[in-house]
């Protein structure tokens, strides 16, 4: 049973999460030959202050 953990920046809508869940599930069904009910997905919302890129927290990074 494949399990996927998706960590996303806070603020994604339910529709965006639904679309991601459907797309990831479909990809794993095709790649692994499992049924959709065998795919487990956890989506974890993270505040920008808890994410760093290049050693710099996202709120501290220059806006591009």
Feature map (PLM): residue ranges:
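A domain-level signal for the structural core that forms small-molecule/cofactor-binding pockets
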Residues: 1-64
């Amino acid at each position: 049973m494949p399990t996927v953990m998706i960590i996303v920046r806070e603020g994604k809508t339910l529709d965006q999460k639904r679309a991601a869940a459907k797309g990831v599930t479909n990809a794993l069904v095709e790649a692994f030959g499992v049924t959709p009910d065998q795919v487990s997905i956890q989506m974890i919302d993270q505040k920008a202050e808890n994410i760093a890129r290049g050693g710099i927290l996202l709120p501290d990074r220059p806006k591009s």
